[in-house]
Each structure stands twice: as structure tokens, then as C-alpha cells.
């Protein structure tokens, strides 16, 4: 998110960035994955050639860039990243803090898109936001690599101050039970079509530049008022939420 990053500069050394996959001119009003943009994953090959694969620890990506405005990966994009990472022995990490636990109609967006990463980070939905909790899922090979030391040694040298917090764990287990018992992931898939139809009904309204429904999420771009970026969105929030 450029406007966020420019306030703080580069926080982590040795990090390269792939091109943003969103192009309104080519993707506007797409439902689900846009058709255009899979080729942008090939930029990873240039980065590998520049630095050598042995110096690249991992590729980290959100299957759906949420905070930037609900920007789903183009069709075939994640598959290309997976293939390039496999070709060069690079780990692929999915940040599913937002997309995990039903928002995309599945436990994880990785399942929806049929692409298996080496690691998944998650939070938020694991407790339905009731109590802060997060975690990481890893492939068995990665797990085994950390478990080769003696039993008395710390398996993953990391901060443990709040690990396995009893309240957070109880909230997480209860939430997962509800997801399973009430079939909420399947229900999200069932409602997805209605959600997209309702969102796209706003297309003809003035100042609507783009609508991007995917799963039970949607991003809507509104034309800015002159000299007041964000004001139109705030007014829409006030009128649509606080007044109703």
C-alpha cells in the first residue's frame, strides 16, 4: 500500500516486490478472479536471475490483497508463482490472515484456488475476532526440519510470551467447532452468487469506478471528490451504515 509505505520507508532490508496485479482498465467489474494479469508472476523469474535463487528465502503473497481494496489474484497467477518457486527451490508463503476461515468459502483461499503453499499464516477468523490469536501452518518437511534437535531444546527459537494463551485457544477451538457444526464455509459458498449480484447492482450508480466481488468480500472504488480523497467513501459509510 504505497500511501502507507511512504510514511515509513523501507522497513526490512533485502526485500524485493513483485508488480501490483491490479489494473482497472483491464479488470474493472470482474467477478472473482480477473482474466488479465497472470503474466505478472513471471517478474519473479527476473528477480531470481538478478539475485540467484539461493539467496531468496521465500515469496510471500496474499491470495487476495484485502487491505489494498479487495484485489483478488488474476486467474493462473498463483499457479505460476507456485511453479516458479518449485522450479527454483523457493518457499511460497500465503498470508491468509484475512482470507482464512470461510471468507472465501473455504477454510483457506489456498483451497479455493487449488494452490498449496509451503506455509500459511492465519489469525482473525480463527477466533471470529473475539480474542486475538494467530498461527502458522507449514508443510511436513518444514516441520520435521525444526524437530530434528534433542527433545530438551527449543524447537523453534522465537518469542513465546503469549504462546498458547488459554483464553485464545479456547476461543479458537470453540470457533472451529461452530464452523464445522454449522457448515459455515459451505454456506458462504452458497451465498456468494447472491452477494456478487447485490454488489454488482451498484455498477450503474454515479461515481462507481469498479466493483470486485469474490467470496463474501467485495471492493468498490468510488471516484474521489476534488481535493478530498476518501471523503466520498466516508459519506457513503455514514449514509449506508450509521443512518440505517
Which stretches of residues belong to each language-model region?
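Conserved N-terminal phosphate-binding loop of PLP-dependent enzymes in the Aspartate aminotransferase
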Residues: 1-244
Amino acid at each position: 500500500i504505497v500511501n502507507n509505505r511512504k510514511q515509513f520507508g523501507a522497513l526490512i532490508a533485502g526485500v524485493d516486490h513483485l508488480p501490483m496485479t491490479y489494473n482497472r482498465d483491464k479488470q474493472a467489474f470482474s467477478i472473482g478472479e480477473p482474466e488479465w494479469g497472470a503474466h505478472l508472476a513471471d517478474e519473479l523469474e527476473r528477480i531470481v536471475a538478478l539475485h540467484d535463487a539461493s539467496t531468496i528465502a521465500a515469496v510471500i503473497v496474499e491470495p487476495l490483497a484485502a487491505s489494498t481494496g479487495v484485489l483478488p489474484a488474476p486467474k493462473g497467477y498463483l499457479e505460476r508463482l507456485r511453479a516458479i518457486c518449485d522450479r527454483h527451490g523457493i518457499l511460497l508463503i500465503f498470508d491468509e490472515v484475512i482470507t482464512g476461515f470461510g471468507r472465501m468459502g473455504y477454510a483457506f483461499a489456498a483451497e479455493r484456488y487449488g494452490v498449496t503453499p509451503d506455509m500459511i499464516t492465519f489469525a482473525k477468523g480463527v477466533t471470529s475476532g473475539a480474542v486475538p490469536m494467530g498461527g502458522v501452518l507449514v508443510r511436513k518437511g518444514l516441520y520435521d526440519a525444526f524437530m530434528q534437535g534433542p527433545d530438551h531444546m527449543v524447537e523453534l527459537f522465537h518469542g513465546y510470551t503469549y504462546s498458547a494463551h488459554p483464553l485464545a485457544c479456547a476461543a479458537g477451538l470453540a470457533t472451529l467447532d461452530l464452523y464445522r457444526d454449522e457448515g459455515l464455509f459451505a454456506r458462504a459458498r452458497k451465498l456468494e452468487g447472491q452477494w456478487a449480484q447485490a454488489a454488482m447492482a451498484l455498477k450503474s450508480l454515479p461515481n462507481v469506478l469498479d466493483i470486485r466481488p469474490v467470496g463474501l468480500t467485495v471492493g468498490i472504488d468510488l471516484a474521489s471528490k476534488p481535493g478530498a480523497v476518501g471523503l466520498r467513501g466516508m459519506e457513503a459509510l455514514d449514509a449506508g451504515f450509521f443512518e440505517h
